[in-house]
Amino acid sequence: MRNLQSNIGIQYTAIGDTERRGEVVSYHNSPSPAFLLKATTDDVNGLSESDKLNINSSGLFAKSKFAIGFEVEKTRLRRGAVMEYALFKGFEYDSSCGYEAITHVLPLVGRSMWRTKVFNMFAEAKHIIDEQYSPSNHKCGGHMTFSVDGMYGHQLMDLIRPFSGIMYALFRKRLANRYCCENIEMASNFGYEKYTVCKINDHSLEFRLPSRITSVKCMMDRYKLMYAILDFAINKPDARLSKFHRAIRPIILSMYEGNVEKADAILGLAVHFTQFLKTGKIDKYTCGWFEGWTSSRYGSFGSLRAKYSRTFRPIGCQQSSLNDFKARYEILL
């Protein structure tokens, strides 16, 4: 990502209002985020007509209707890299993995100069984000909080549910993680419980399911995917799943470094998770991921039997069910 030198439009720089933005502080005690949702009309030049639906414009200024924030969890931060960045609101100690860097509230926009400027902030923070500089491990997560202007969290949950099967497929190995395994149906009336797949807040949602962010490219791909999910949820809620999958396929291919076989396997699995989110019934395609059959010899076999579909009866033939599951998803294990 190039270093933008243009003086046209919005400029993202460190705020400089407190030294604490460049220090690691105790959990939940980093400074408040800035809401970086406004730009100029110069920044939205190049947006497609459909992407302009997600922007409010008034005179020379524009405001994103969609917003997103990331948590970047690490076991260690590169020496000398902890400082204030335009991207991060601050750094905190985290008891589960060590440290986390938390972004400001960012505009979630389509392909444009504005998006390029957001991605440039990611690149400027590479010594925090990239694994080669600041490592992480399996205990680290990649939580994402997102919102739509004027919408309550529970309303947004109902809208994104039909397009969230891809998140389950991508982060399938975390579906049995105790920190993000509740409310697997993404019910909008579940309340404000924390350890859910997608936590409901008053005016936002937090996907807790994603795994750790390991690179700037990883963060960019997730940004693009979340934009696509919200764009379909808000503007094309009745779109066929096949149309949505065609739209996100280039992003999934990028996530898997162009591996067509893996990308198509993920999209295929997403179809089954989407069906689960529609019916609430677990079947042979999804059970192993929900019950964690890949995390140990047996995982939590049978723990979700109350949600099994009528035609799915693995109880009593445990080993053969495990073998069939592992054979079916060998490429994704």
Where on the chain are the PLM-derived regions?
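C-terminal accessory/tail domains of diverse enzymes
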Residues: 2-136, 149-333
